[in-house]
Amino acid sequence: MNDFSFEDKGLISRSGFGSRHVRRVVKALALIFSLLILYLTISNVSDSPPKRDSLSLDDIVLQKYKPSYKQVNWIDSQGLKDTFLVKYGDLINIQDPYNLNKTLFSVSDLVYNGIQLDYDSYSISFDAKYVLVSVNKSQRWRHSSFAQYYLYNTETKDVNMLGQDNEHWTISLAEWSPTGHQLSFVYNNDLYVRKNDGNVQRLTYDGTVDVFNGLTDWIYEEEVLSSPSTIWWSPDSDKIAFLKLNESEIPTYHYPLYTAELDPSLPEFDYNKDMAIKYPKPGNPNPSVSLFVADLNSNASSNFSLWHNEPLAEPVVQNVLWVNTSSVLVQFTNRNSTCITARLLDTELKSIHTVKTECLEEGWYEVQQSAKMFPLNNSLVWENWSDGYFDILALDDYNHLAFIPFNGSSPIYLTSGAWDVTDGPIHIDGDFGNVYFLATLKDSTERHLYYVSLDTLEIYGITDNGEDEGYYSTSFSPFGDFYVLNYHGPDVPWQELRSTKDKDYCLSLETNSRLKQQLSSITLPSVEYGKLTFNDTTFNFMERRPRNFDVNKKYPVLFFAYGGPGSQQVAKLFRVDFQAYLASHPDFEFIVVTLDGRGTGFNGNAFRYSVSRHLGEWESYDQGQAGKFWADLPFVDENHVGIWGWSYGGYLTLKTLETQDVFSYGMAVAPVTDWRLYDSVYTERYMDLPQYNKEGYKNSQIHDYEKFKQLKRFFVAHGTGDDNVHFQHSMHLMDGLNLANCYNYDMAVFPDSAHSISYHNASLSIYHRLSEWIGDALGRIDPSTGVRQHRWD
């Protein structure tokens, strides 16, 4: 039994007209039709809709249809509350919500020693006195980069480089303080602060290639903080908490660069360059971590021993939060993320207090940085809410807002129900006692903005009117009177400034009118969202069909899979992507399906935790069951059902091809093939350490190569410079296939490309290879005959 039917898709009318009513309607329609024909004959005017263009693959890859969003920087300009900066072309304008709108600086102002700076990015100090611009940026890892920085004084118009003794330093990270215009930055893995008076203060002296101060190493950047920074400023900007990461015990992974960073004029050009990265794999050492707090007034740093001599060995620090100007809350898990602890440290008294420790028997604690304090200097009415913090905790299988007292007593839940708080608390209104958050209360595929009253615990919807679909995000001003509301879909995105005090206030920041105009001339697929039920479990799916879909034809079906733990692909977002191209282009006209199987997020924690310790089992089964459902539909060509994915989606593609017989074709890009080869923090969170789950690791790897010989054909692609999912994974797969005498596959290798496969025009190349290959597999329509041709049948 399942929830999907033709009625859901609008293929069968469910009108309830009686026969007499039908006859009247038919007569009326006949009269209208006759008059319409007469009118068209007399006027000789054609009102047929204009011919639309097909989506271009190059336009998809080059993101022609990517929506625009204004970068809004909240500042404190000349004592004006809730002012912000917005970029308009080459101008950076300072605005307030009602009156002020003036240019703070122009790109033409960025001149150093007579040379116009071609900047990569910019950020503004909170007092708007300085603009920090980066130049000559080079990518480090996914979220980090190296760059040279310049400071533009908005009052004097002077431009100075960030460095010391007229040296132009290449800097790893630079961040403004929350007040004034102090600047923290990392150079050669040591932490510095540029003070308000312009002097530079060095805080650490032990930075090396293995020791990182205030900066993430590879594993913390990729799997824990999703940021290059481990710096947290105190609210008054007098102190900095930061992590010291030491990866000297981590084994080094080496991979070659064949073309990147090689100068053909040098003798060593004939030899490839060797790249080395400290990459912890399951069961191997992780970086050791220490928390320091630096007092900028005394130039003293203190090391706080938060996790020594206790069961929570090898901690992974998830979050650091300043409670006030002298106390810090630190949240960390054990190595495999089954236990979590929150500790409060007083930086002046040097005392440490455990607020909360809890463990799970099944599942894991996801990484989150959602904890927030009640605003300082709040009204005495809400004084009881100041001695603790707000965070997201599990309650009856879902994640909800809670207040956690510092005294260790039980949490107070602010929300409850069969839905998730996905982001919050975003803002806490200290005047009215309202806590703002984003949630799936309306539907798990949507995100709406709400607030809950601390007085009554009633929930009020801001974007949720009970009818309109929507996926929103938001950012609040520091004082909380205004917020930027971003609408991400399903229709064309827009951006507005709204007020928490005045419901009628609305300032449009971005309408994406140009994008709307572009979309008006192209053919897009129809998109449907629904739920599919099998084995008493319900799944969200998204289906894209050709715009001229004909129920009497037979269509190939392509599943697009990701499926990683806690992820979500079936969401009501605006997207004109590769899947839209394959569904709408007249050469292909595939039905493209995405199903969020077990292990994915926002369908209950039991649904998510079901894959714990045996990745790949339920995820592939769910894709297979969904594949069988679509293959049985009368308008589907059951012999041409394929699946493809990237990264975890590549792994899921291979695992599904290995274990499910409904798919004849598949494409796996940058796939994991053996979890023993992936990084420790991610893998152990879901699989535990290898020594405690040998059978789980064995079963989860791609290993039954005989099953691949039964496929019609499959395709694998990987970049040799992938620092995330190493090329080693695909080489292990190729070796197993060769040993099994399996020859029905194709492979594309992209020299020196990282996980995104973009180096040296590889972005265009990979998608052209994918589209050509899947066209050969599932069939390409001959424009002269309208007949679908299959290369490998």
Swiss-Prot record:
Glycosylation sites: 101, 136, 246, 299, 303, 324, 336, 377, 384, 407, 535, 761
Membrane topology term: Single-pass type II membrane protein
GO MF: aminopeptidase activity; dipeptidyl-peptidase activity; serine-type endopeptidase activity
Gene3D superfamilies, sorted: alpha/beta hydrolase, Dipeptidylpeptidase IV, N-terminal domain
GO cellular component labels: plasma membrane; vacuolar membrane
Chief location bin: membrane
Pfam families: DPPIV_N, Peptidase_S9
Signal peptide start and end residues: none
Keyword Flavoprotein listed: no
Cytoplasmic side: 1-24
Transmembrane segments: 25-45
Domain of life: Eukaryota
Positions annotated as active site in the UniProt record: 647 (charge relay system), 722 (charge relay system), 755 (charge relay system)
InterPro entries: AB_hydrolase_fold, Pept_S9_AS, Peptidase_S9_cat, Peptidase_S9B_N, Serine_Prot_S9B/DPPIV
Keywords: Aminopeptidase, Glycoprotein, Hydrolase, Membrane, Protease, Serine protease, Signal-anchor, Transmembrane, Transmembrane helix, Vacuole
Assigned protein family: Belongs to the peptidase S9B family.
Protein's name according to its UniProt entry: Putative dipeptidyl aminopeptidase C2E11.08
Upper lineage: Eukaryota, Fungi, Dikarya, Ascomycota, Taphrinomycotina
